[in-house]
């Protein structure tokens, strides 16, 4: 299979004109795929869709960033498409392969000192300043996103509940 990998990398470099860094990354991804197949006592050309999905999940579990996993999945899809075109495989197990969804990054938050500085900004002697300070207070007190705050309607607010 290393001949097929070398041929694919040559194709990426010479025909598709991919950057050297991309080709190196794809070589690393295909090396990881080969290692994964070997650990499961299979040849790369014998992997099926379930194997490839498990491979992508393994990359996530190993701490690769979602972007790196997405690149590896794109590499694997392209590689199997290449193998199919070269008649090295009868079917493309990666045809509909998608990268697993990552947990969304946790939002960053302001420390107490930054909140105090933010609350001190609006000029509360002006109606707009009062409005802005109220909006900032609601954001801080409730943890709403800005889009959620902007979507609030007067009927959504229960002033008696506090």
Residue ranges, per PLM feature:
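Conserved catalytic core of the tyrosine transesterase superfamily
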Residues: 1-162
């Amino acid at each position: 299979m290393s001949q097929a990998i070398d041929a694919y990398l040559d194709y990426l470099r010479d025909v598709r004109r991919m950057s050297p860094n991309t080709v190196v990354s794809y070589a690393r991804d295909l090396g990881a795929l080969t290692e994964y197949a070997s650990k499961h006592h299979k040849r790369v050309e014998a992997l099926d869709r379930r194997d490839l999905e498990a491979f992508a999940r393994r990359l996530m579990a190993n701490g690769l960033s979602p972007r790196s996993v997405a690149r590896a999945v794109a590499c694997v899809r392209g590689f199997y498409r290449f193998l199919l075109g070269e008649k090295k495989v009868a079917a493309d197990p990666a045809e509909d392969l998608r990268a697993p969804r990552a947990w969304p990054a946790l939002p960053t938050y302001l420390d107490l000192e930054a909140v105090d500085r933010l609350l001190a900004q609006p000029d509360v002697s002006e109606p707009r300043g009062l409005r802005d300070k109220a909006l900032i207070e609601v954001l801080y007190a409730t943890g709403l996103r800005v889009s959620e705050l902007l979507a609030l309607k007067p009927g959504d607010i229960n002033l008696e509940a506090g």
